[in-house]
């Protein structure tokens, strides 16, 4: 509604203003200096708003998008599009939406609600009919925007990302750089003064790839039909309703324009709810009203007349009306030409200089180098600010962003064809980045031309432990009341403004009581509010301030973000501490598959820890406290806000998620991860990525088992296998993912178009969506860790096609096709699938979960309001003594387990075998694989049974196996009495649930807690673990475990051998780290470890020997 309906109004009611055009003809005409007798002087330069054009860049609404995406088909379409533009004298520049846009958050919330309903309609349609849904239900496949961005970079199409206000930046960028036209589909663009405005929805490429057509909007025809001067468009847009002044606040004004005699007046109030007039009726009525305004410069008089019937917040509405007029006036006025903000010509990747004055976030305080001290750089005047001041407080300095273009045009600069072989495997941002680190004296040194000489991040403790300069500003005490912190306005101002969103309006529903009171005093009955819940300003929640980020790291992040070289989440996490997660296709009635937002939340938690260098900063703090003979400080949790919508979670409020640090090793700071050039730095990047994906195993780095271009695929599948709840992947589903990734048909999109799917599998569609959500998080983690995997090998067209996966899954699940037939009879391909499956399952063992446990809620964190979030599951109170082993207890599994506070950050470990059962240990190296089957072993120390505190039975213990620690206390199984409510056989075991809604809360753990699945109990110290490792022989064996219960292996087949070893099938007790020594090469692939001098054969032999030694 409101201004967003104006674009549809043009399509339906102004047919003469929509003219079909062929872009190749425009590129040969007078617009670019061409004619009948002369060739065009310049290319037709068009700016494309990718946010409105994603479905067209994807290739259109063809039906196979529901299966997770046909990425090679998309790649072929974009290749044809780039070829057609190059041959037709057209230069495209694609602008992606990388802004958080808190001011438009209420629009995003409504859109997520609609897409969530669409997702349920899609699932229901596929379940009932087994056919693809209609194109009107098109829901972009997960990760589509990032895939399109990487594909455009591959085809040398220039890209950029917005950073604050997407619409303002697109409009300003279009004018500032002399683009001939804008390809988009948004009312904000239609109401601004753009010479040539083309439709993104009508953009079509002919089958032969020679004709590129679209529709052009003639805005002077629209103004003629509305009988409205274009100079009055800003007031017209402000009175239609927009993100600043919503149409709910203008509803009474719109109804007053229609009058009581209007045929629709009877619809004004229905069942005490607000009913807005139809959009086309409102547009005509507002146009008539604006046409009759005598003085358009007197905004006070206009606002007084518009809000004459308002009963409350009139002053606030007047202010927001003026802001809305100013917002659209800034986009409508022609801008004086400014020197490009980034490049001399034609300013790719930059921010517009025309953006209205932006109030900087109070959390940011980045020292800028003095521009006057560098006379070679021209000062760019910024509107509403002082000359030479950038429009944003954290803009990159001019000298750093001026590339040396001497002797090279932009096409040559952005071309990847001339990059040497080693350069093609460098991170994406280093190829076109102006930072030249090769000339630096040290790997962590950054050229002073790019970074300011005085960095507030340097301190005497930064080099401790060889970590280099940290990305945190040391020595500053963070407090809630500190000026410049990341706290919301509550921390600094009036409590009534505590949840105000920057640039957004006050929610109309927040004043429902005030409207009701005013209705008794006024003569005009007010229209009831449309919304029954708080919106916009009342959605947000105040969080603790983020740790200050060093200017060097922030400028690098901003530079890569603007140039489209980095995942957009990263910059917003570093600066604002919040992200928005889009809806994917999920069946909310299916209890077997978790929501993607919850499934991959631990990945994001560890990425947050990497971005803020939690491990290193806390380690330094503890060392300083130890030197000063002080107790370790109690660290405040680092909270990130995640806006998401899924089953049981509304997007109206954010979830507070805590950042986590790796316990196995100290991850280096962000500056070293991103800018370090040493071999150790490259190894640490890879280890950090694998640790985030819970895939830190040697086999993942063995190219003989996992090719580099399939590493993301295997990491995501391994992560899905480790989910601690209900099984996600069955054996045949895992084989289907691997078989389609190795199929030659993957790279034949034409053959895949001819492939017929008789009946779509609803579970397969959801698995595809979950997998692509994992790929999305893998791209996020890869960029956050410094791109250890080359971007060419991360793209999903290297390893996934949704339609091909559906075909393989139907054969594997319904027809029970053997693996060799699943691989089209190719024995070599089947052998590769076996190796990849072994690598994915390395170190994982599976056992059946017997009973769910009821858990009492733990106390909430002190700074969260108790009424905001539901409390989480917490631990069961401990017993007196250590239990030996039992089944059916779930914690978060995987290789890294979870950190649980016993007092702030005095942690013990909760680890798990395969992610289904947890165990307590002092370190990961102390985990064993004894008694990991589904049958519970008899405790060797015996036990007794109590009912209501009375002993009613005893039993003797079994003989101790090897590798024991000595006697254990007698086990007590209580039924009823003080311990009632627990399942029988479960002895006081704390279980920490990290997958859930709301913020992550802590439960208390105790050293007396029992072990799980027959594993050693919690080690009180590292010395105890070391003694056990020395005393333990390598002869402990674990029986073959049937994985049929978890859907990974057939019941009649043994556990596959790892790394091709022979002998009795075994499941290793634990997975050793792939990079347990940072000085070792991180990969036997020379592309991933260019500085290694050993031969591939010798490195593979060493890796295999290490794995075999571990197994023995």
UniProtKB/Swiss-Prot annotation:
The keyword RNA-binding applies. Residues 827-1112 are annotated as: RNA binding. Residues 479-500 have a biased composition (Basic and acidic residues). Residues 403-418, 433-445, 503-512, 922-934, 1070-1090 have a biased composition (Polar residues). Arg-980 is dimethylated, probably to asymmetric dimethylarginine. Transmembrane segments: none annotated. One of its GO terms (molecular function) is RNA binding. SUPFAM superfamilies: PIN domain-like (SSF88723). Residues 372-525, 919-943, 1030-1090 are annotated as: Disordered. The modification N6-acetyllysine is found at residue 930. The modification Phosphoserine is found at residues 958, 1021, 1042. Residues 339-403 are annotated as: Interaction with YES1, SRC and FYN. The modification Phosphothreonine is found at residue 653. The modification Omega-N-methylarginine is found at residues 871, 882, 884, 980, 984. It is found in: Cytoplasm; Cell membrane. One of its GO terms (cellular component) is cytosol. InterPro entries: Coact_PPARg, PIN-like_dom_sf. In the brain, predominantly expressed in the hippocampus, caudate putamen, cerebral cortex and cerebellum. Expression is restricted to neurons (at protein level). It is a peripheral membrane protein. Keywords: Acetylation, Cell membrane, Cytoplasm, Membrane, Methylation, Phosphoprotein, RNA-binding. Belongs to the constitutive coactivator of PPAR-gamma family. Component of the oxidative stress-induced survival signaling. May regulate the activation of SRC family protein kinases. May act as a scaffolding protein enabling SRC family protein kinases to phosphorylate and activate PI3-kinase. Binds IGF2 RNA and promotes the production of IGF2 protein. Interacts with PURA. Interacts with SRC family protein kinases YES1, SRC and FYN. Upon tyrosine phosphorylation, interacts with PIK3R1. Interacts with IGF2BP1/IMP-1 in an RNA-dependent manner. This is Constitutive coactivator of PPAR-gamma-like protein 1. The lineage of its organism: Eukaryota, Metazoa, Chordata, Craniata, Vertebrata.
């Amino acid at each position: 509604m409101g201004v967003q309906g104006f674009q549809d109004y043009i399509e339906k009611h102004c047919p003469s203003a929509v003219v079909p055009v062929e872009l190749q003809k425009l590129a040969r005409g007078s617009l670019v200096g061409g004619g009948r007798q002369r060739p065009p002087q310049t290319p037709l330069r068009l700016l494309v708003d990718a946010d409105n054009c994603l479905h067209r860049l994807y290739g259109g609404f063809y039906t196979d998008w529901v299966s997770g995406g046909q990425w090679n088909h998309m790649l072929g379409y974009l290749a044809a599009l780039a070829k057609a533009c190059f041959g037709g004298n057209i230069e495209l520049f694609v602008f992606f939406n990388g802004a958080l846009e808190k001011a438009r958050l209420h629009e995003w919330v409504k859109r997520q609600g609609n897409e969530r309903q669409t997702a349920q309609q899609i699932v229901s349609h596929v379940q009932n009919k087994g056919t693809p849904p209609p194109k009107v239900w098109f829901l972009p496949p997960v990760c589509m925007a990032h895939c399109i961005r990487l594909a455009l970079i591959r085809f040398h199409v220039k890209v950029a990302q917005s950073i604050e206000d997407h619409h303002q930046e697109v409009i300003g960028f279009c004018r500032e750089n002399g683009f001939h036209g804008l390809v988009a589909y948004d009312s904000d663009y239609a109401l601004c003064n753009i010479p040539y405005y083309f439709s993104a929805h009508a953009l079509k490429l002919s089958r032969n790839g020679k004709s590129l057509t679209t529709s052009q909007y003639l805005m002077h025809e629209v103004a003629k039909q509305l009988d409205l001067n274009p100079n009055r468009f800003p007031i017209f847009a402000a009175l239609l309703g927009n993100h600043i002044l919503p149409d709910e606040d203008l509803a009474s004004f719109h109804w007053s324009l229609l009058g009581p005699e209007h045929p629709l007046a009877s619809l004004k109030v229905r069942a005490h709810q607000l009913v807005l007039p139809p959009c086309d009726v409102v547009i005509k009525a507002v146009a008539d009203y604006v046409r009759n305004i005598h003085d358009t410069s007197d905004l006070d008089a206009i606002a007084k007349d518009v809000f004459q019937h308002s009963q409350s917040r009139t002053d606030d509405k007047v202010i927001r009306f003026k802001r809305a007029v100013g917002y659209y006036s800034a986009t409508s006025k022609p801008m004086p030409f400014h020197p490009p903000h980034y490049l001399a010509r034609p300013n790719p990747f930059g921010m517009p200089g025309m953006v209205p004055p932006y109030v900087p976030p109070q959390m940011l305080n980045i020292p800028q180098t003095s521009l006057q001290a560098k006379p070679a750089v021209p000062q760019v005047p910024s509107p509403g600010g002082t000359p030479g001041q950038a429009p944003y407080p954290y803009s990159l300095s001019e000298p750093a962003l001026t590339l040396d273009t001497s002797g090279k045009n932009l096409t040559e600069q952005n071309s990847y064809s001339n990059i040497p072989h080693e350069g093609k495997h460098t991170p994406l941002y280093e190829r076109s980045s102006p930072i030249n680190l090769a000339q630096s004296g040290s790997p962590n040194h950054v050229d002073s031309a790019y970074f300011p000489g005085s960095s507030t991040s340097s301190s005497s403790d930064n080099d401790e432990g060889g970590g280099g300069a940290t990305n945190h500003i040391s020595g500053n005490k963070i407090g809630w009341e500190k000026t410049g912190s990341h706290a919301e306005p509550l921390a600094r101002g009036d409590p009534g403004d505590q949840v105000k969103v920057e640039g957004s309006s006050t929610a109309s529903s927040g004043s429902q009581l005030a409207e009701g009171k005013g209705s008794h005093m006024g003569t005009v009955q007010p229209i009831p509010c449309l919304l029954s819940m708080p919106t916009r300003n009342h959605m947000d929640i105040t969080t603790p301030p983020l740790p200050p980020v060093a200017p060097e790291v922030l400028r690098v992040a901003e530079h890569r973000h603007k140039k489209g070289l980095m995942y957009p989440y990263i910059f917003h996490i570093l600066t604002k501490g919040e992200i928005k997660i889009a809806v994917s296709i999920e069946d909310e009635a299916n209890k077997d598959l978790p929501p993607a937002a919850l499934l991959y939340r631990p990945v994001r938690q560890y990425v947050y820890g990497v971005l803020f260098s939690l491990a290193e900063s806390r380690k330094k703090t503890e060392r300083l406290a130890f030197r000063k003979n002080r107790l370790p400080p109690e660290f405040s949790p680092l909270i990130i806000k995640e806006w998401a919508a899924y089953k049981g979670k509304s997007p109206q409020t954010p979830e507070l998620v805590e950042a986590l640090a790796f316990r196995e090793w100290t991850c280096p700071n962000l500056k070293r991860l991103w800018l370090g050039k040493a071999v150790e730095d490259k190894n640490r990047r890879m280890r950090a990525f694998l640790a985030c994906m819970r895939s830190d195993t040697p086999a993942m780095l063995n190219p003989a088992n996992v090719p580099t271009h399939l590493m993301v695929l295997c990491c995501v599948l391994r992560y899905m296998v480790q989910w601690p709840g209900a099984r996600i992947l069955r054996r045949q589903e895992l084989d289907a993912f691997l078989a389609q990734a190795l199929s030659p048909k993957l790279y034949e999109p034409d053959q895949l178009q001819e492939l017929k799917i008789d009946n779509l599998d609803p579970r397969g569609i959801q698995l595809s969506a979950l997998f692509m959500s994992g790929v999305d998080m893998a791209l996020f983690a890869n960029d956050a860790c410094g791109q250890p995997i080359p971007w060419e090998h991360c793209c999903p067209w290297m390893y996934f096609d949704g339609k091909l996966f559906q075909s393989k899954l139907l054969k594997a699940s319904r027809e029970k096709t053997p693996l060799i037939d699943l691989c089209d009879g190719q024995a070599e391909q089947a052998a590769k699938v076996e190796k990849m499956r072994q690598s994915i399952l390395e170190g994982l063992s599976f056992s059946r979960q017997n009973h769910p446990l009821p858990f009492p809620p733990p106390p909430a964190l002190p700074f969260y309001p108790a009424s905001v979030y539901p409390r989480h599951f917490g631990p069961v109170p401990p017993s007196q003594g250590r239990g030996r082993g039992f089944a059916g207890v779930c914690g978060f599994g995987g290789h890294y387990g979870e950190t649980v506070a016993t007092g702030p950050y005095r942690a013990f470990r909760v680890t798990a075998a395969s992610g289904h059962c947890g165990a307590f240990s002092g370190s990961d190296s102390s985990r064993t694989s004894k008694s990991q089957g589904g049958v519970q072993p008899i405790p060797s120390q015996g036990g007794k049974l109590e009912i209501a505190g009375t002993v009613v039975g005893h039993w003797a213990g079994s003989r101790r196996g090897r590798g024991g620690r000595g006697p254990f206390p007698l086990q007590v199984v209580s039924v009823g009495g003080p311990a009632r409510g627990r399942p029988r056989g479960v002895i006081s075991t704390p279980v920490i649930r990290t997958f859930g809604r709301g913020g992550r809360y802590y439960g208390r753990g105790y050293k007396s807690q029992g072990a799980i699945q027959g594993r050693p109990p919690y080690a009180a110290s590292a010395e105890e673990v070391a003694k056990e490792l020395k005393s333990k022989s390598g002869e402990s064996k674990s029986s073959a475990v049937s994985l049929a219960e978890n859907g990974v292996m057939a019941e009649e087949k043994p556990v596959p051998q790892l790394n091709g070893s022979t002998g009795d099938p075994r499941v290793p007790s634990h997975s050793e780290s792939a990079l347990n020594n940072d000085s070792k090469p991180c990969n036997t692939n020379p592309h991933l470890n260019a500085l290694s001098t050993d031969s591939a054969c010798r490195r593979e032999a060493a890796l295999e020997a290490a794995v075999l030694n571990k197994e023995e």
